[in-house]
């Protein structure tokens, strides 16, 4: 975080990154002292409602964040910023998005939690668009021209007013991460899914909260002790914030978490709390052994849609096999229940650091914030939706193979599988049932070895 005082004192001359949050109501003219060098400008958390036309004079500006301000329209000056590729205006009051406001090189657009009812057809001309985040608006339709965005990989359209999921969307060649829960077209299926969930009701007074374990967009997770007639046990408790997130609505996440059921490669759910003193939706989950850690970090500003791994992270072939077997099994389990995870990424996987043969490479898939449900009886549509997630698995498999040592001929079949999962023709990709069978066939040819590379 920087300050206006630093800017005025000349302490930030030549800066490439600037982050200001000082309850600003106007764009500080002092920022223009950086127009020759500034690449990333973050004005999140102010009271701004407009940007100056002179913003187009910034010669190197690539990334602009103006979330949590008071904009009612996406500023048209953005369209004149020739190097701008990433634009974030989450949680404003934006109702209008004009064609003129869209930068030619746009890769990543965040308009979550606004009041947008329609988008311009010209959005489909943004050929470089990879990531589009529109959850929590008032959209009743998407521009059909988005079918031209062949590089689009991640799409968030949850919590809108969409009456149907466009057919062209399911044919986008690179789309891998999709969230659409909380729309009229999915409401009935979500209600049915919630009714089938066999979840224990856990009294709030039976829980004693401990330390905070983590915090995400949708809620805060604490360790806790659960008391019952059988004794006490350690659990994890997620307290949902209740607001719309970049992925969707917390109520949808909670419903899917309960409906997902038990699986050895999913983070287990013990039940829900319906009597929280503040009415806060609360989920009680299995407490994960500290020997499990996140497999990767989320995408960076530069990687856009690809996770960031520790530079020294490597896996043995046996550890890799255990991981991809576990992920494929978990995804297949969800698809059999009509659930699309929507965020099948390494950063949502916990993997075991334990070196025992029983635990080597074991993974747990969590975070249902982007999950959606679908009707498995509609086989053609279900197959298309499922194979979007197959592409996400292909990206993950490709990333893991790149970090596997030794990466010998025994893994050749997995390289071929990754290529098939990434095919541009959606229905030519294998199903998770096929994927699981092929991975098992490779695993059967391998011998047990130490997990450390």
Place the predicted regions along the sequence by residue.
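Short beta-strand micro-motifs within the conserved protein kinase catalytic domain, predominantly
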Residues: 268-281
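Structural motif at the C-terminus of the N-lobe alphaC helix and the adjacent alphaC-beta4 loop
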Residues: 255-266
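Catalytic-loop of the protein kinase fold
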Residues: 331, 335-352
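Activation segment signature within eukaryotic-like protein kinase domains
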Residues: 323-324
């Amino acid at each position: 975080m920087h300050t206006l005082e630093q800017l005025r004192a000349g302490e930030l001359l030549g800066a490439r990154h600037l982050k200001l949050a000082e309850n600003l109501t106007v764009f500080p003219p002092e920022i223009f002292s950086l127009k020759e060098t500034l690449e990333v400008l973050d004005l999140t958390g102010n009271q701004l409602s407009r940007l100056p036309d002179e913003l187009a004079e910034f010669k190197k500006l690539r990334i602009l964040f103006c979330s949590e301000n008071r904009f009612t329209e996406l500023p048209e000056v953005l369209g004149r910023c020739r190097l701008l590729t990433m634009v974030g205006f989450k949680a404003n009051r934006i109702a209008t998005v004009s064609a003129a406001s869209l930068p030619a090189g746009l890769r990543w657009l965040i308009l979550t939690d606004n009041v947008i009812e329609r988008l311009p057809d010209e959005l489909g001309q943004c050929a470089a668009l990879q990531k589009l985040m529109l959850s929590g608006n008032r959209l009743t339709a998407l521009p059909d021209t988005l079918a031209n965005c062949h590089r689009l990989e991640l799409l968030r359209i949850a919590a809108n007013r969409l009456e149907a999921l466009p057919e062209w969307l399911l044919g986008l060649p690179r789309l891998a991460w999709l969230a659409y829960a909380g729309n009229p077209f999915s409401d009935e299926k979500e209600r049915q899914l919630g009714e089938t969930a066999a979840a224990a009701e856990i009294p709030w007074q039976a829980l004693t909260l401990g330390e905070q374990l983590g915090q995400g967009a949708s809620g805060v997770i604490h360790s806790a002790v659960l008391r019952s007639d059988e004794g006490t046990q350690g659990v994890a408790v997620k307290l949902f914030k209740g607001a719309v997130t970049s992925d969707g609505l917390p109520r949808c996440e909670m419903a899917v978490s309960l409906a997902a059921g038990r699986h050895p490669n999913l983070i287990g759910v013990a039940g829900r709390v319906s009597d929280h003193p503040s009415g806060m939706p609360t989920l009680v989950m299995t407490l994960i052994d500290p020997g499990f850690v996140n497999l990767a970090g989320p995408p960076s500003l530069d990687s856009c849609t690809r996770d960031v791994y520790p530079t020294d992270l490597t896996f043995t072939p046996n550890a890799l096999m255990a991981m991809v077997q576990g992920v494929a099994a978990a995804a297949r389990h969800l698809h059999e229940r009509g659930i699309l995870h929507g965020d099948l990424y390494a950063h949502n996987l916990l993997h075991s650091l334990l070196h025992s043969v029983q635990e080597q490479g074991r993974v747990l898939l969590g975070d249902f914030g982007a999950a959606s449900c679908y009707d498995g009886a509609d086989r053609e549509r279900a197959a298309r939706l499922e194979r979007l997630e197959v592409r996400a698995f292909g990206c993950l498999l490709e990333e893991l193979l790149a970090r596997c040592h030794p990466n010998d001929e025994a893994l050749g079949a997995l390289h071929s599988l990754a290529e098939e999962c990434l095919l541009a023709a959606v229905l030519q990709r294998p199903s998770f049932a096929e994927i699981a069978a092929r991975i098992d066939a490779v695993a059967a040819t391998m011998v047990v070895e130490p997990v450390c590379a």
